[in-house]
Regions:
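Membrane-embedded alpha-helical bundles of polytopic integral membrane proteins
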Residues: 2-152
Length: 152
């Protein structure tokens, strides 16, 4: 038990040493890091459910998460104001379209990856938006999460 706690503490300190400078720098580097972390989180959630991410369903889920996390309208200027939501919707439409044309892939199979990509992607998007609004707002959001997490 103590060994696991020590391992988690060391990993948290190492992650903070990498994450805090990225948060201070902000910009594209933070957005890419948040997108990769969101994809890692969805990968873990899919594995917990017994789903493989190296399938079309898993790859579309990772793409949907990344599309929702990153403010795409900053980089793809032809997209409307909520470009990441539009891109997310297109990927979800493809996933739901697969349920129509496949006998082995039902709507029940598609719901969990869609829900996880929305939940994780929107959460990381909120952190990216908070950082765009200012470092103080991003730190406040993180302190709230860390305070509630440490009490659990």
């Amino acid at each position: 038990m103590k060994k696991d706690l020590l391992k988690r503490t060391i990993f948290a300190a190492l992650a903070l040493a990498i994450f805090i400078p990225l948060l201070v720098i902000g910009g594209l580097w933070l957005q890419i890091a948040m997108g990769l972390l969101a994809m890692l989180g969805v990968h873990e959630l899919l594995q917990m459910k017994g789903l493989n991410t190296m399938t079309p369903e898993g790859l579309l889920t990772l793409l949907a998460t990344f599309a929702l996390t990153i403010p795409l309208e900053n980089y793809l200027t032809f997209l409307p104001v909520d470009g990441n939501v539009v891109a997310y919707g297109v990927v979800i439409f493809i996933m739901l379209g697969c349920t129509v044309f496949s006998k082995n892939y039902t709507i029940e199979d598609a719901v969990y990856p869609i829900a996880m990509s929305f939940y994780v992607g929107f959460g990381f998007n909120a952190l990216v938006d908070a950082r765009i609004a200012g470092l103080d707002k991003a730190l406040l959001a993180l302190c709230i999460v860390w305070a509630t997490d440490s009490g659990a």
